[in-house]
Amino acid sequence: MPKKQLPPKEERHKLFGSVPPKERTKPIEKNKMADLQNTKRDFLFKLDAVGISNVKYPVIIHSDLAPKEQTSIGTFEFSSSIPTMSKGTNMSRFMELLQEYSSSGMNVSISELKRFTKELSGKLEQKDATIEVSFPWFFERKGPESQSAGMNHADAKLSVTYDSNSGFSIDVSLSAWITTLCPCSKEISEYSAHNQRGNVTLEATLVEDFDEAKIDWKLALLEAAESNASARLHPVLKRTDEKMVTEQAYENPRFVEDMVRLIAADLYEMPFVSKFHVSCRNEESIHMHDAIASITYDKSSE
């Protein structure tokens, strides 16, 4: 049995600083409350983006790789521009619309986000709206010889902007891990060569009429990254697999510069990509520093 005789909970709250409510003088009816955000006046500058970020919600991901449908956690950012004559935006409307979509299952698809941004633009009474969602995308990966399976993942991002004047713009991004083996180390050494994990980030602007029913953009970017690496990463490797992966890496040495150029070539050949940015960071196994390289290319500039 407790030995202490404690005061009632209300008294404990008072002990730690709680005070009784004061007399209320401001209106409680919505139509009588001050609405500062909707104040119309010259506020000096138009704002490019106003909204909310770091919003986490469950989402449904569709994939051409197993698992074909998966539930993940989406991290959202919502925004719109506001003109000089508007003080602010209606922050609650971002969350209200997200909850509405989530209640029937929020699919992270280009078509869904197009519909969302156009509707959001109307609710905000602004000419544009942007939604960006980041999420971990899981995919099954089998050992090259044993076929022993496990799950890998990459960090994906999809951003859709609607503008009542110019239509939709679609940007995608994927960050994935790969293996790189140093060409210089292989060339100068009697045997062996140092190798390491590299992190590749591919950012691409898609054409407005991109057809996600025909092409899984996540898989297209993943293949561009992994197919140009010294070797792919695997969650499960038996001895026969490890031999194959090790030898493959030795046969395909890559500098960090090589990686971004080879990936850029693949993206350049994709007709549904209008511009892109590729960066690679190798966690050097024989140094304390990382090696980096990047490239940006806009096909429309040709």
Swiss-Prot record:
Provide the site residues for: May be catalytically important. C182
Key word Transit peptide present in the record? no
Enzyme class, UniProt record, top EC level: hydrolase
What Gene3D superfamilies does UniProt report for this protein, alphabetically? Urate Oxidase (3.10.270.10)
| Annotated pathway | Cofactor biosynthesis; 7,8-dihydroneopterin triphosphate biosynthesis; 7,8-dihydroneopterin triphosphate from GTP: step 1/1
Q: Which organism is it from?
A: Oceanobacillus iheyensis (strain DSM 14371 / CIP 107618 / JCM 11309 / KCTC 3954 / HTE831)
Q: Which Pfam families match?
A: GCHY-1
Gene Ontology molecular function: any one: GTP cyclohydrolase I activity
Stretches the record annotates as Disordered: 1-27
This protein is called what? GTP cyclohydrolase FolE2
Q: Which gene encodes it?
A: folE2
Q: Which reaction does it catalyse?
A: GTP + H2O = 7,8-dihydroneopterin 3'-triphosphate + formate + H(+)
User: Record's PANTHER family?
Assistant: GTP CYCLOHYDROLASE MPTA (PTHR36445:SF1)
